[in-house]
């Protein structure tokens, strides 16, 4: 896949359902993380790190610690077979800095744009069970979870619409 920036941005949506059995290789995940080296970094601190979660068993342990689609109250998230193929856990190394300014968002967006270029999609997740997820990932104290980036081959089609009357809430068709 090759896209111009506007095309990448339009294709880069929050995908919440995936073709779960289409795996993403560790090499592809390393390439996505590698893109962040080219991002701006406040004071050039380079304080954001990533935990790559590609193993099926570990993915299964991460999943129940995530909250999906806050505006879709009657939806508990993707079902088995629709779950992400991998996760990149964005971590702030607090031994370097206490605040990453806006670097976390810049890097998360860069990772998703890279994923789109490879034919994948993802969702940046901020709603998670922090302590439980830290335990699952066996993280040392100085690493703070900033975001969970869920990745996979999208199983859904996202339709962009102009916002009407200030209503910014997303929705889902009854058939998913």
Language model features by range: what are they?
Residues 1-176:
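Acidic, surface-exposed loops and disordered segments
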């Amino acid at each position: 896949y090759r896209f111009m920036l506007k095309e990448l941005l339009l294709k880069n949506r929050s995908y919440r359902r995936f073709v779960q059995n289409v795996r993403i290789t560790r090499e592809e995940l390393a390439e996505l993380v590698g893109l962040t080296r080219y991002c701006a970094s406040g004071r050039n601190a380079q304080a954001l790190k990533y935990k790559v979660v590609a193993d099926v068993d570990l993915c299964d342990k991460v999943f129940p610690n995530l909250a999906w689609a806050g505006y879709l109250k009657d939806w508990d998230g993707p079902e088995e077979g629709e779950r992400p193929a991998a996760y990149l856990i964005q971590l702030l190394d607090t031994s370097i800095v206490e605040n990453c300014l806006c670097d976390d968002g810049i890097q998360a967006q860069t990772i998703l744009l890279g994923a789109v270029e490879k034919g994948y999609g993802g969702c940046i997740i901020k709603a998670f069970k922090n302590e439980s997820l830290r335990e699952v990932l066996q993280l040392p104290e100085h690493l703070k979870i900033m975001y969970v980036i869920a990745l996979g081959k999208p199983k859904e089609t996202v339709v962009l619409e102009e916002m009407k009357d200030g209503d910014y809430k997303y929705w889902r068709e009854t058939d998913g």
